[in-house]
Every structure is written in structure tokens, then in C-alpha cells.
């Protein structure tokens, strides 16, 4: 349901009510004319009146004629006052955008960019400011709608509006705009954006993932998010997208500017394309049959140089000064020939059929001292995955508007310029690298063990060493292999594949051809990049980007089916490299968790941390204590961790020592009559001076032992007051007497 009304003079609002049946309704309200009046278009978007975003769209007055791309910039500004917080940075003000903000920028950019007229060269900037936020609501999908609405009002040549919704599969129902609390019960979560085309809603962008709890919910009987279920979710999103688009249209009709005349710069004129086609078509068609990327690109460069020389300076120099046009026409001809061959001959650049996968290779343990590593290759795409394990205290701390304050699994993706044989900047990650890392992270989170099952912080790094199509999905495969090599007990292995799409008008009807495992060139010249990751049982993540105004959902459903077949093939190759978790690397720390009563936490810590510091110093272990009484003990080796656990248990779960028990104790005090030895925290015993000399009389205790020395002792007696008498045990002499016979008496380390 939608509604539009005029408030004060010049202030208009439109409302979209989204009905989720048993899950209630969500209300999205768009208001314009009150804030940011000097922007070309501005909208305040509300979600149930608590979450409030301001979106402002502006455009430069003069075009950037020298650009060969559309200069669209999307920025998301998270204001901490939106959640009633002061930033945690040193200067107590917002700094660089958070990962959530960067990912939201990408969510907005991807459906908006193809909606602008082709050839626009004026700089366009969309700035979304988060001004108020209900802590239960993700703001990203509201931002998509706000950005579309402000752009629709701006007078720019924009074929919107674009509607965006988050859909969560909860108890068998697809729910729009779910809260974080509802997402805790969700099996699948996806953001879908689209626009109204005729009587249908065309899908423009999808970003989807299974949740941390998906595997457990499916095991308990919930519907697994299979390809068919995901396709049904795309259909379920359409009515909500339609409602949101209609509200934006009504607002634009009431308050929008007329579309202004903006100069459009076609990449080339028709005469340039005709000249290039006549000069190079035959040679280009042959070059596009070369399977090797580098050989093909070298040959294309040669042909392009010859074409520029021929039509740019020869034949009366009719294209002199129009070299950029000739270059753009050459690229357009390349695109045309690639697409024609796919549509007509069902053959791709490297000679594969539509559903064929390139050669696959998987190997683990490729970096000597890494906790886990793997190399995954698909054709010329080569990804190195490296896993690092450590204490949970090293998990990432997050200072953003998200309710998530820590991140245990961190996935970082690097794309150096040499991966494509080029030079370029290296250093801090760009938005693309952050987005690709987040996609691979979402693909793996549903199969990770819980904190209780595997109490480690996990850092996964994906190094794109060679790129020719879908390094992000290659990263998913390499990461699965690497984590298994590190000994991480994944619930199931995950693989990913990138799908493409080529469309053409034949007899007045649009025909679509889906491609499995696309090359970089097929991504560049095709209409869609559709990445799907999952296990054998269900989809864990997917991402859709399109250059079209939208793609019918039945075409996406077909692509999902092709992706499933390819994923199964890749999983088989990965299983040959490693089928189950390896033993943990000797270089990885050993982390163990134990639970103690909450009222014992203070005793374990001790006054001013004295007790926990002494345990750390004596054993070399690192200890982290949670508020619920969970204690994580990490050490370089198992014995050190066990020693620390014994000491903690002796404090929190004390057991009285018994006569005959043996301990490796520490001398804590000497006196004229003997030495006091610490057996357990808070439990000392006395070795009388007469028992220190191995039967020989000694005059002074310090002649035999000093404070800090380790002694192997046995409890000889415990009197009625609990005082413990000890005797020194000479294990070597005793073992010699027994001829190496095994000792049955229990020993404990203090």
C-alpha cells in the first residue's frame, strides 16, 4: 500500500506499507522539501519513524569530456549520534568509513549505475547520512531506497526508481525488512533491488547469504536454502519492490524536477565503428579464438595498433584526432563479436561450451610455517589462501552503528596489480577488495564451528595471484581448503562459481544465454556477473551485478541450476586435495576452554591480578576470562595449556590433596627447620630439614634448596589441622630400583 500527501508548503511525503502477514508490517516513508534544499534532489527516508536517513543527490554543471566512464560516486556517512554514542576514536569524531558503510555504498551503486543514461559524463554524487537508527534495524536497504528517491527527484536522466528490500526466510516465510532479532531465526538473508518494467519487476542486484545458524536450523528440520528456495525468495521480493517503487514515483510526481538536458558523449560515432569493422572484423574474429588470455590480449593489441594506424592516420587521415573514438569502436566491435559467437555458435572465447568449467587444481600445505594454506587454480585464475589461528582476544573490535561489536572470523582479500600482468598502486584495500573479502567471508560463515566448538580467532587471507575471472569465488574455494588444512572443523566444504549472461534480440524477443565459469573478458562484455557459493546441501552466498535494466527471475533461476552443477564438480576436486580437517599445525597455538563458577572469577584473577599473572608466568600460557565464567587458555604447546588449566581448576574447583600423591612443587619459603613447597594455589606443605639431605645431616636448608627451586615431593602426612608434611622423591633412583617398572602413583603438576 502506498500514499502521498503534502505537508507544509513545499514539503511532500510518500508512504509504503509492507505487509509481512504474521510478522506484522513495516512502514517506509519518504519526505522531501524540508532538509538539504540546495541539493538537486534530497529525501529523508524513515523506517517505522525510528530509523532516519538523509539522501542528497547532486551533479556537476560541466561534464568531464575527457572521461571514458560515468563518474558516479556514492558515499555513506555513519553519524554516531544516530545511536546516541560518542565515537571511540582518539579525536572523538567520525573518521574513515566503516566496513558496513563501504559495503552499503556498493549496494547502492550497483543498481543505480546502470539506471543512468549511457554516455553521461557529469559528475554525480549521492551522499547518504545515517541520522537516527533503531538498533534493531539494518539501514542498508533503506539507504538504497533513499538514494533512488533523491536521484529520481534531481532532474538527472535516470530510469528509476529502484526499490530495494531485505528478505529473510524465517519459519518458512519470506519476511521483508527483518530486524536483527528476527535474523537470528533466519535460514537465509538477501538484499534484492529491482525496478518496475511493464507488468513485472526486473531484478537488478542481489546480495545474499546463509546465516551462522543455518546449518543448525536445517538439522533441526528447517527448510534448507536450496537454489529453488532462493529463486522463490526473488519472486517473493517483487511485490515489496513494486510497492517501494510506486511510493517513490508518487513522490516524484508531486515534487520531482523535470528531467534536464545533459550532454551525452557516445563513446564513438557510427562512421568510426563502420571503419573499424571494415578494417579489422575478420582478423579480430580469429584473434578471439585464442584460448590463452595473454596471447589473446597481445594479438588484440597488435590488431588495434594496426587499425589505429590505418584509419587514424591513413586513408586521408579522416579520423585524425579521434583516436579515442577509434579505440572505443574497436572495443565495441570486440564485444559484438564475442557475444555473436556465444549466441549463434554456443561457443565461448576459449572454445568452451556454455556450461563447461576450466581446468581445476587444488593443493594444500603450500606455505611452510603458516597454520593452514592452500592454492586453488581455475584456468588462469590462481588464488592462495592462508589461515591464521589465535586467541579469541585477538578478534576484531568493531566501532560502527552495527550491533556487532566483535568479529571472530576475518576474511581479507588482496588483489595486487601483477595478478593481471599490470603495474599499479599497492597498499590499503580499495572498495572492491573490501567487497570481495566480505562476499567470501559470508560464504564461509555458515559452515564455521561455534566459539565453544573451536575457541579460536580466525584470520583468512586470500591472495589473488592470477586473475582471469571470478577471483572472489576462487577465494571461497582456496579458503575452504586452507581452513581444513589448518585443522578447522568446518561443517561442510564450500565452493563457488561465477555465472555470466549474454542477451540479444532475435525476432523481436530477448533471448538469454547463461554461461558457467566466466572469463574476465566474458564478465566485461557480458550482461551479468552472478556469483554463487554453497555446500552440497545449500547455497551459502550469492551476488548479482547486471549492466541491464533488470533480468527476469526465471533467467536467474536457470543460472542458479547451472551453478549448482558446477559447484558439485568443484567440490569433488577439492575433496581429492583434502577431505577432512588435518591435524593442527605445530606452529599454531593450542587453545582450550573451561568453565568455572562466576563467583570464583575474582579468586582466579587474584588481588591486582596477582594470581592470574603468576599462572601466566609459570606456565607461559595466555588466559582470557569471560564474564560468564568461560576461560580460554592458549599456549604454544599442549602441556603448558594443561598446566595452566590444572592451576585454574585448583582455585576454582579445589580438591584436597591426599597422602601418597606426588607433585612437582615450587619452594616458596625457607626456614631453619625446613622448606615450604607450593603444591597447588593456596596449598603449601613442609619438607622438614631432616628429609632434605637424602639421609645425610645438613646444617642449613639453603645448602640444598632455595626459593624458586622445583622439587618432586610426596605427601607423607596430613594432620588434623590440615598441615601437610612432605618428603622429597628421587624419581631417577626409584626408577632404577624398579628396573624401569612403570609407576602407578598419580602425579600432578603444581
From Swiss-Prot:
Alphabetically ordered keywords of this record: Cytoplasm, Magnesium, Metal-binding, Nucleotidyltransferase, RNA-binding, Transferase
Top-rank taxon: Bacteria
GO BP annotations listed: mRNA catabolic process; RNA processing
Enzyme Commission number(s) of this protein: 2.7.7.8
Annotated S1 motif domain residues: 660-729
Cofactor(s) the protein needs: Mg(2+)
HAMAP family per record: PNPase (MF_01595)
Protein name: Polyribonucleotide nucleotidyltransferase
Taxonomy of the source species: Bacteria, Bacillati, Actinomycetota, Actinomycetes, Pseudonocardiales
Amino acid at each position: 500500500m502506498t500514499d502521498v500527501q503534502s505537508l507544509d508548503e513545499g514539503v511532500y511525503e510518500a508512504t509504503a506499507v509492507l505487509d509481512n502477514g504474521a510478522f506484522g508490517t513495516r512502514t517506509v516513508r519518504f519526505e522531501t522539501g524540508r532538509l538539504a534544499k540546495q541539493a538537486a534532489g534530497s529525501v529523508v527516508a524513515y523506517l517505522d519513524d525510528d530509523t532516519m536517513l538523509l539522501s542528497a543527490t547532486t551533479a556537476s554543471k560541466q561534464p568531464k569530456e575527457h572521461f571514458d566512464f560515468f563518474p558516479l560516486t556514492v558515499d555513506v556517512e555513519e553519524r554516531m549520534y544516530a545511536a546516541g554514542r560518542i565515537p571511540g576514536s582518539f579525536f572523538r569524531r567520525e573518521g574513515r568509513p566503516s566496513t558496513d558503510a563501504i559495503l552499503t555504498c556498493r549496494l547502492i551503486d550497483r543498481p543505480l549505475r546502470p539506471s543512468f543514461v549511457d554516455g553521461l559524463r557529469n559528475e554525480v554524487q549521492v551522499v547518504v547520512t545515517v541520522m537516527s537508527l533503531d538498533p534493531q534495524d539494518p539501514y542498508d536497504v533503506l539507504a538504497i531506497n533513499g538514494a533512488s528517491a533523491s536521484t529520481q527527484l534531481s532532474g538527472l536522466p535516470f530510469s528509476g526508481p529502484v526499490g530495494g528490500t531485505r528478505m529473510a526466510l524465517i519459519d518458512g516465510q519470506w519476511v521483508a525488512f527483518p530486524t536483527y532479532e528476527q535474523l537470528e531465526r533466519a535460514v537465509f538473508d538477501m538484499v534484492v533491488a529491482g525496478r518496475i518494467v511493464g507488468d513485472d519487476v526486473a531484478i537488478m542486484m542481489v546480495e545474499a547469504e546463509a546465516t551462522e545458524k543455518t546449518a543448525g536450523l536445517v538439522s533441526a528440520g528447517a527448510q534448507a536454502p536450496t537454489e529453488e528456495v532462493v529463486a522463490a525468495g526473488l519472486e517473493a521480493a517483487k511485490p515489496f519492490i513494486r510497492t517501494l517503487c510506486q511510493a517513490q514515483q508518487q513522490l516524484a510526481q508531486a515534487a520531482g524536477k523535470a528531467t534536464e538536458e545533459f550532454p551525452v558523449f557516445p563513446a564513438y560515432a557510427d562512421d568510426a565503428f563502420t571503419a573499424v569493422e571494415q578494417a579489422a572484423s575478420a582478423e579480430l574474429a580469429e584473434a578471439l579464438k585464442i584460448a590463452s588470455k595473454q596471447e589473446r590480449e597481445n594479438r588484440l593489441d597488435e590488431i588495434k595498433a594496426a587499425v589505429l594506424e590505418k584509419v587514424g592516420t591513413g586513408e586521408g587521415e579522416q579520423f585524425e584526432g579521434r583516436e579515442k573514438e577509434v579505440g572505443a569502436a574497436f572495443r565495441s566491435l570486440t564485444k559484438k563479436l564475442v557475444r555473436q559467437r556465444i549466441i549463434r555458435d554456443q561457443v565461448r572465447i576459449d572454445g568452451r561450451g556454455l556450461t563447461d568449467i576450466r581446468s581445476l587444481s587444488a593443493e594444500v600445505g603450500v606455505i611452510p610455517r603458516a597454520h593452514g594454506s592452500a592454492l586453488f587454480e581455475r584456468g588462469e585464475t590462481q588464488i592462495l589462501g592462508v589461515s591464521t589461528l589465535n586467541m579469541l582476544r585477538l578478534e576484531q573490535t568493531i566501532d560502527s552503528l552495527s550491533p556487532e561489536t566483535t568479529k571472530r572470523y576475518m576474511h581479507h582479500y588482496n588483489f595486487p596489480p601483477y595478478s593481471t600482468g599490470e603495474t599499479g598502486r599497492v597498499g590499503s584495500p580499495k572498495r572492491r577488495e573490501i567487497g570481495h573479502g566480505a562476499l567470501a567471508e559470508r560464504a564461509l560463515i555458515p559452515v564455521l564451528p561455534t566459539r565453544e566448538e573451536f575457541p579460536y580467532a580466525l584470520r583468512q587471507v586470500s591472495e589473488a595471484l592470477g586473475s582471469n575471472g571470478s577471483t572472489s569465488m576462487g577465494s571461497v574455494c582456496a579458503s575452504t581448503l586452507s581452513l581444513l588444512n589448518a585443522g578447522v572443523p568446518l561443517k561442510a566444504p564450500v565452493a563457488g562459481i561465477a555465472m555470466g549472461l549474454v542477451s540479444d534480440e532475435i525476432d523481436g524477443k530477448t533471448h538469454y544465454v547463461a554461461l558457467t565459469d566466466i572469463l574476465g573478458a566474458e564478465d566485461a562484455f557480458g550482461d551479468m556477473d552472478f556469483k554463487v557459493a554453497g555446500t552440497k546441501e545449500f547455497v551459502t552466498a550469492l551476488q548479482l551485478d547486471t549492466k541491464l535494466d533488470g533480468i527476469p527471475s526465471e533467467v536467474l533461476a536457470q543460472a542458479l541450476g547451472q551453478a549448482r552443477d558446477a559447484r558439485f564438480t568443484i567440490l569433488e576436486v577439492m575433496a581429492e586435495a583434502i577431505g577432512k580437517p588435518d591435524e593442527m599445525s605445530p606452529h599454531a597455538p593450542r587453545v582450550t576452554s573451561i568453565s568455572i563458577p562466576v563467583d570464583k572469577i575474582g579468586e582466579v584473577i587474584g588481588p591486582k591480578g596477582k594470581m592470574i599473572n603468576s599462572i601466566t608466568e609459570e606456565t607461559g600460557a595466555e588466559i582470557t576470562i569471560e564474564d560468564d565464567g568461560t576461560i580460554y587458555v592458549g599456549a604454544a604447546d599442549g602441556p603448558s595449556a594443561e598446566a595452566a588449566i590444572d592451576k585454574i581448576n585448583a582455585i576454582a574447583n579445589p580438591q584436597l590433596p591426599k597422602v601418597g600423591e606426588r607433585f612437582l612443587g615450587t619452594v616458596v619459603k625457607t626456614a631453619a627447620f625446613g622448606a615450604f613447597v607450593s603444591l597447588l594455589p593456596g596449598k603449601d606443605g613442609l619438607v622438614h630439614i631432616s628429609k632434605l639431605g637424602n639421609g645425610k645431616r645438613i646444617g642449613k636448608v639453603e645448602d640444598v634448596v632455595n626459593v624458586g627451586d622445583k622439587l618432586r615431593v610426596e605427601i607423607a602426612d596430613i594432620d588434623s589441622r590440615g598441615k601437610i608434611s612432605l618428603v622429597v622423591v628421587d624419581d631417577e633412583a626409584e626408577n632404577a630400583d624398579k628396573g624401569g617398572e612403570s609407576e602407578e602413583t598419580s602425579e600432578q603438576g603444581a
